[in-house]
Amino acid sequence: MRHYEIVFMVHPDQSEQVAGMIERYTGSITEAGGTIHRLEDWGRRQMAYPINKLHKAHYVLMNVEAGQEVMDELETAFRFNDAVLRNMIMRTKGAVTEQSIMLKQKEERAERAPRRDDREERAPRREEEAKPEAAAE
């Protein structure tokens, strides 16, 4: 069996159905004896260029180990699913299990978000401090 990296983009109006699509695709891979090394749901993201007058899409990344028959079946499923805007299947030299850069960036943003909340809480205090000075003048 060979190792593959699969990225597919789903129509933003079909974002609710992404979980079912992932289940269906991973199920077909595991039923055929393949393994899934990495599965990342990147969520809705801005695309680099519009596709069918759409500017956003729901991205999913999978690293799998499977046979050629399964990959042909998966490619056919992508082709006939109208919700899948684009897909890319690349053969890799080995299994990739570490987090992708996209997911690391998403987690870093999530860690920084509480800091922004702290700043927003502090900002009114500074304004309150400025008000008594203005009243003294």
From Swiss-Prot:
- SUPFAM superfamilies (alphabetical): Ribosomal protein S6
Which GO MF terms are attached to this record? small ribosomal subunit rRNA binding; structural constituent of ribosome
What is the annotated signal peptide range for this record? none
For region Disordered, the annotated ranges are: 96-137
Q: Name one GO biological process term.
A: translation
| UniProtKB keywords | Ribonucleoprotein, Ribosomal protein, RNA-binding, rRNA-binding
Kinase as UniProt keyword = no
GO cellular component terms? cytosolic small ribosomal subunit
Q: Where is there biased composition of kind Basic and acidic residues?
A: 104-137
Matching entries from Gene3D superfamilies are given as: 3.30.70.60
What InterPro entries has UniProt attached to this entry? Ribosomal_bS6, Ribosomal_bS6_sf, Ribosomal_S6_plastid/chlpt, Transl_elong_EF1B/ribsomal_bS6
Which family does the record assign? Belongs to the bacterial ribosomal protein bS6 family.
What does this protein do, in the record's words? Binds together with bS18 to 16S ribosomal RNA.
> Which NCBIfam families does the UniProt entry name for this protein?
S6 (TIGR00166)
Record's HAMAP family? Ribosomal_bS6
Protein name stated in the entry: Small ribosomal subunit protein bS6
Q: Which organism is it from?
A: Vibrio atlanticus (strain LGP32) (Vibrio splendidus (strain Mel32))
Name the gene.
rpsF
